[in-house]
Amino acid sequence: MSCIDRMSIMGIRSFDNRSRESIQFFSPLTLIVGQNGSGKTTIIECLKYATTGILPPNTKGGAFIHDPKICGEKEVLAQVKLAFRNTNQVKMICTRSLQLSVKKTTRQQKTLDGQLLILKDNERTTISNRCAELDSQVPLSLGVSKALLDYVIFCHQEESFWPLSEPANLKKRFDEIFESLRYAKALDQIKGLKRDQETQVKVDQATLTHYRSDKERAEKIELRVHESLKRISCIRSKVEELDQEITETARLQDELFKSTEEYEQQMITIRHLESQSDIINTTINDLKSQMTITDESSEDLEKLHSNFAEKVKEEQELYKSLEKKRSDLESLLKSRRELLEKLTGDLGKIQGEIESLEKLKVKKSTMINEIVHRYNINEINEEGIMTEVSKYASLVNKNYEISSGKLKERQVAVRARIEGIKAHEMFLNNRVSEINSSLEKQLTTQKELRSRFEILFPVKLQREDFTKDVEKSDLWIKSLRQEYESKNLLELLDKHQTALSSVENRLDEISEIVDSYHKYSGVRTKLQVFEENKTNKSAILANQLMTLKSSFSEVMSYELKDDDNYNEELDKLVEDVRKKLQEKEEAESSLRSVRERLEIRISLSVQSINDLTENKKIKTKTLKSYSGTFASMISEIKALESEIEENRKTLHSLQFGSTFYEKAIEICVDQHACQLCQRSLDKEEEKLFVEHCHSMIDVIPSKSAEVYSHLETLTKTFKNLSEAKPIFDEIELLDKRLSETKTELSDLQGDLQGLDIRKDEIQSELDTLYLRRANLEKLQLLVKDISNLEEEIRTIDRETEVLRIELPSSIAHHNLDEIYAEREKLLEKRGYLRKQIERTKLEETSFKKKIDDAVLANNEQKLKLTKLNFQVNELEQLEKDINKSSEDCDLQKKKLLEVSSKQGSQAPFLNELESEYEKLEADIQEMAQKSRTEILEANEYLHQLNEWNSELRIDVSTKFKCIKEKKSNIGEEVRIIASKIESTDDNLRKLQERLADLRTRERNASDNLRLRALMRQLEEAVTQKNYLLSQQSHDDRESFRERMQILKSKYGALNAERAGLLGECKQLENSITKDKEELNMEFKDADERFRRQLIKTKTTGKANEDLGKYAKALDVAIMQLHSMKMNEINRIVDELWKQTYCGTDIDTILIRSDSEGKGNRTYNYRVCMVKGDAELDMRGRCSAGQKVLACIIIRLALAECLGVNCGILALDEPTTNLDEENICSLAKNLSRIVEFRRKQANFQLIVITHDEQFIRLVNSDAYCSYYYRVKRDTNQKSMIVKEPL
């Protein structure tokens, strides 16, 4: 059971928006006392708003929130917090927040996000922040409905008389409290659902029969598919066996192909070996003609060759070391020469520095003379002169400090007098500003008063106009009431309700007729389904017949007649196509065999071309250094031979000439005669002859080296060309064989192309036959479908005839469409009448609202008239305030004139003092500038002399001598290095000559080794060729061909048998595909659909029966619950009335609930009072006190009966309009109720009253120790104070 714990209020009504006021609710009784207007009712309003989210009545425009004008703010935030325990005794906190903003002309109230917290196990969990969710969650947590919280538990004082309100409002509130409309709507929905489900059950029965037929047909198709799959499995196993035999046959063919390929390869190898032998023989002959054959063994030649290589390597290493040595010497020579050039430059620089120092001495002497004359110095010593200059600078600085100090003292005194005068002026200015500010405020106030006066000035005229408007409004209200009485809206409403009752009775009769008609709806539904199926299948049959005829004419080029036997005709055509296919497939297999043989020969030719081309590339790479033809190479070899011979002769002649000239000189010196002519020579001729011989001897070595080098080049070229000649022979032979092989390949490719053309023709004919066979097979399947459809139509006709016999003839007399049409018209009429009733009610409500609005507007006008009277009084007061303000302004203006006259009197004296101050400042600046200039000049002289002295201390002559000596040593090193380079060059020339002789001897040994290697290669090639020729004689080439033909025949036969089996398998697969397509398209999930429909039909039938039972039980339960609750409520009301009411005019009161329509589930409510046997409506016949007492008692009874989970009840001013006896009686009854319910843990009675005597009568000190007093503080803010009883 739920209960409330405490609540805090902030910013609601008269409660302050800056602080919270809290109240704790006790069990079983909480008393709240306060004077009228203190804020007691606000507590009930906050409880109702926190639990339901409903604002109190008449709170539009933010009246529920603390007024911003009172607190002087533009925006006020309000908040209500309620702590309570839900039905599970879990503590929860509900927080609701509001905001009221005031703008220039409007107010805006805004509901902010709230919060619903749950506190469990010391953890805080937020359930929701949305206001809409709080409105539903809080009543749910308290265990009562929102209507019960609104109308019973936390009922507002202004709405507390609702039990005696007009019938419509009373019915609405009782229906909300009992939640009767919800149950009535649920019951109507259940019954409507039951009727709909009965119709659905009948349709489901027909659908179930149809699904059963589809299921049986699907099972037949699945059986046929299963048999076809078994046949396909057998065929595939047979095909696998054939595939193994075909693979084995292909393997044997491959082995024979490989044997044939090996034979051809051996022939190619033999031809290649013959060609290679010819090339080697040619090379051997050429090599013998160009070399000297030695008798040494190959091992000796190899050793000699390797020794040559070592010697050459040693000589080359020695040559490289000498070259490196020469390079190092050249680098050293270069660096020494660069250093020599640098030293020469340094000597020039030092010479320049010596000249600069001489000039600097002259400048220094000139400056010293200038200083002596400028400062009148008698010293001759340089140091003494610099000391005198420093003293002069110090003296100038000291004189400046003394003079500037005196001027600054005078300046400070003048400045003090200036500041005093300015302070007095500032005081006067501030005074003027204050008077001006005060004057401006006075003028602003006066302006505002005049503005307000101008605004209120038309009020007098408005008051007269409003008086006339109030009189017109009274007349308008009177006319509206007369018009409302003339329309007779209540009589019109009764008329429409009578017509609506008649229409609903006729609809009930039609529902009974439809129920009786639906007993045989299952048979009619089946007939309708069968007729639709027959129509659909007939249309499909006609379409398929047309498709069959058009397809047959397209395939066979002639039309099929209606009386033809489709199956026999198609079987004949299929057999004819099968025979043609067999013939063409055999021809295609034969062509494929021939083509395979051609491809093998082409492959061998291509391989041979590739080998020859690759061999040619290898040979050509060896000749990449020679770009000429074979003929040009022969002529070039011959030319080289003659040129080599000439160069050898020339070299021999040169070697002989050197000996000859030396012998001639010897003879000339000894015998003084010429060696050739033996003529004697005199001294002059002898001298000339010796010089000539020496010049010839000097020329011969260089000429011999030149001729030797050229001879070496010619010999190397001759050797390269001699080696290339046999390779040219091989390339010519390869070109010839390439040409022959390409010609053969071209012929084979031409034959293959012819075979391909023939094969394409046969393949085209095969494709045509395959397409025709496929079309014929499709036609066979179409004929089969047509037969199935004809059989299905005959079955439907038989089943339809059986159903027509079962259908009774009496059903035909009722036309269901006409009945439904009449029901539709009645439904439209019922809707129209209901709209008319609603429209009449709306019109009545509108008239009443119009009258109420007019009355409200009239009251507002009267209120405005009163406000205008107040404004006229305010206008008179404003006139007085304006006059007083004018007098104040005149007084302030006089004061302003007095102060202004005193301003500016000290201005001339102030100007004189400021001029004097500026003059003193200028004198100080001038003195400082002069002193700084003299000090800077003296310091500059001293600085320049110090710098020049530093430069003159450097010793340059010693450095000059050192560099000159170093330059002489470096020059000597350069000459020594140059002589070493010349010696190294002589050694390099001698070493080159030794290397040339070694290479000539090495080449001859290498040629002998190469000749012996070629001889061995020739012997190996001849041996291998003889072996291959001997092998060829043992092979029988014809046997290869016979065995190949046998294997090809077997391969073709196996493929033909395999193709036949695959064709049959293809036909079966097509048949299975068609059957599966039929299953997927027409019978997809037939079993599942039948099973689901069977389950659905059975379960829907059973569920519909249970739905009827549930509707009947719910109807009875609703009526019993309502009757039981009303009896209990009336019992409690009777008991409380008799115990409370002290008068004798009314024995008791009760609540009557009269049934409104058929079914006793809709009620009209009224409160009656009983006197003896008479029972009268209490509304309009009771006094104000009886009205208050009756409403309290009814609320107590409703809370007792319906608030089982929530024992809370709040009474706001329960003693209103009660006399003293009834107050005492009500207090005693409340005390008795508290005493009886105090054992209930969650019972909480909240009493709010201004009557403290009533509190004592309730016997409050027996149930609680404290009570709460609500009052206003000094700021007129409501506050809650806890006080002891």
Curated annotation (Swiss-Prot):
Binds 1 zinc ion per homodimer. InterPro entries: P-loop_NTPase, Rad50/SbcC_AAA, Rad50_eukaryotes, Zn_hook_RAD50. GO terms for molecular function: ATP binding; ATP hydrolysis activity; DNA end binding; DNA helicase activity; double-stranded telomeric DNA binding; G-quadruplex DNA binding; metal ion binding; single-stranded telomeric DNA binding. Residues 295-365, 630-668, 698-726, 727-809, 814-902 form a coiled coil. GO terms for biological process: chromosome organization involved in meiotic cell cycle; DNA double-strand break processing; double-strand break repair; double-strand break repair involved in meiotic recombination; double-strand break repair via homologous recombination; double-strand break repair via nonhomologous end joining; gene conversion at mating-type locus; meiotic DNA double-strand break formation. It is found in: Nucleus; Chromosome. Pfam families: AAA_23. Mg(2+) binds at residues 41, 157. Its cofactor is Zn(2+). Its main location: nucleus. The zinc-hook, which separates the large intramolecular coiled coil regions, contains 2 Cys residues that coordinate one molecule of zinc with the help of the 2 Cys residues of the zinc-hook of another rad50 molecule, thereby forming a V-shaped homodimer. PANTHER family: DNA REPAIR PROTEIN RAD50, RAD50. Belongs to the SMC family. RAD50 subfamily. This is DNA repair protein rad50. It comes from Schizosaccharomyces pombe (strain 972 / ATCC 24843).
